[in-house]
Structure formats: C-alpha cells, structure tokens
Amino acid sequence: MALLFTGACGYIGSHTARAFLEKTKENIIIVDDLSTGFLEHIKALEHYYPNRVVFIQANLNETQKLDAFLNKQQLKDPIEAILHFGAKISVEESMRLPLEYYTNNTLNTLELVKLCLKHAIKRFIFSSTAVVYGESDFSLNEESPLNPINPYGASKMMSERILLDTSKIADFKCVILRYFNVAGACMHNDYTTPYTLGQRTLNATHLIKIACECAVGKRKKMGIFGANYPTRDGTCIRDYTHVDDLANAHLAGYQTLLEKNKSEIYNVGYNQGHSVKEVVEKVKEISNNDFLVEILDKRQGDPASLIANNAKILQNTPFKPLYNNLDTIIKSALDWEEHLLRFQ
C-alpha cells in the first residue's frame, strides 16, 4: 500500500513524510504545486529513502490530472490513506484575500474527498488549525466551541465539516489534527550536508522563525503586533509545538485510525502558553544576540490566546511528545537558520 501526501514539499508535510518513511514500510506519493513548497525537501527525502518517494507536480484543482493518476495508481499499488497538508495558512493574508482561502483550502479539500470516494480511498488525515476556535482565554479541548474570527480559520472549519459529514454516510474515516503554533527543525538533520528539512518559507510570518532570522543577521529588525492584549504582558500567547512532535502526532493518528477505523479530532500542542515577548527574549538569550524589536499595531484576526488541551491525543493514541521544551524548539530553529546561511 502507498500513502498520498498533498503539500509535502512544505514545512510540516516534509517532516511528516520523513517520519512515515522512517517508521512505516509504505511508499509515499507527494503532490505539490511548488507554489510555497521546495524541491530541496523532496531531494532530502529521496536521498535518505531511495526508491520510496514519488513526486507529482500538480495543483489540487487539477482534478482531471489527479483522477487519471489515481486510475493507474489504484491498480498497481492502492493508496491506504491521504494526508492533506496543501493549504494557504496566513491569518493576515486571509483577511485580505478571503476567496483565495475558501478556494484553495475548502474547495480543494472537497474535490479531494470526491476523488477519495471515487477511488475507494477510505482514510484521510487532515491538517487543521487551532484558529478554528477563535478567541479564548482558557485551554481549548476538542469540544470547545468553534468560532473562527478570520477566513483562514473559517476555511479550515468548513473543510473539517466536509470530512466529518462524509464519514457519516460513506466508507470513509478521517483524523483531524488541530495544530497550534509549529516551530523548530528536524532533530535528525545532518548539517554537514544539504539534505535537510526545516522551514524554508520565504517572507515567513511565524514568530520563532522571524526572531531566529534576526538573531543570525538575516533581518535587521522584527515587529510585535500588539502589546495591549488581555494577557500577562500584553502580547499574544501561543502554544508552540516542535515540528517533529507534530509529525509524530500524524503517525500516531494514522496508526489509531487503522486500528479503530473511527473518525476523530485531536488537538496537537503541549498545553503550555508562551507570550510573544517571552519567545523573543528567549531567542535573544539562547543566541546571545540582541536585535531591534518594534511594537506595531495589532493584526486583524489574531486571537489573544490559543493553548491546547492535549489530553485526548495523549490518552487515546500512541503519541508521546519528545521535544516539549521552548529552549529545545528555539535551539533547533537557530541551528536551522545558521545552516541555511551556509548552504544558500
């Protein structure tokens, strides 16, 4: 059996592909249009796992191309599950370009589910987000009300509903993983080679990556968007998760889906909140470098606090966090940025 990953030339998808290649026997088919992904990630996976990765450059809206591929694939090596990472992910951009988010995220998920039903692909792992919850000042569990305050969160919430409704009427089951804030780089990287995995995102919007870019001199300054939120220091609080732990959460969710054949939703986080100011100061401390930080206006659509209640995934799957430490996350992100300086 094979696994099909969408968007796995990107940050989270590539790390998850590595985890599956390392810990399962399945071959992996990666579909990505390279609009935000990187061939370097495919090269790294192919280098360490030769003859186990197939890459197809395609957009998920190219349904005829994907349909033709699946017609052939299902005859020779049927797909056990789809892991769907392909999506737009910027809260700020979604406020400006909402229709792009509903098209790219929601509509493409709908078309992918239709292909699953047509080709008898019965299992689906979906990358969702804590942003579906909206504003909150407490630890969020999977039963917390959904109230997204931006089109990004709304597009993911609607995608979740498509999957869950389909699972009620078809031989089709899904695991939905609601990510909190992901950071860090692969803990298995060999930085003497170019065959590495990490966040290559251009013009990144992720706090830890931006702060680490400042620390290694790639940026002259950074901004904190809002310092008057109702939090302990006025800046937003987030639950930061190491990308390798998130990858392993996908593996645990997949294994549980195979075992129980039941659709489930899981938060993936550490149930620990760190403020923006705390993260920036920690990056300065670990890197031993100071850099300019400006206080800017709030970004529209940013919740004040998002912290995961992770009890469900810990109690009901094999998932066990390995890198549940802000220092560890930041150190791996700094190592990655220094590596990029050497190999770019």
Which residues does each PLM region occupy?
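N-terminal Rossmann-like NAD(P)+-binding domain of SDR-like oxidoreductases, especially those catalyzing
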Residues: 1-185, 336
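Short, flexible active-site loop motifs that bind/organize anionic cofactors or intermediates
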Residues: 7, 56, 84, 91, ...
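A general alpha-helical scaffold signature found inside nucleotide-binding enzyme cores
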Residues: 104-107, 157, 202, 206, ...
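NAD(P)-dependent short-chain dehydrogenase/reductase
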Residues: 138, 164-252, 282-284
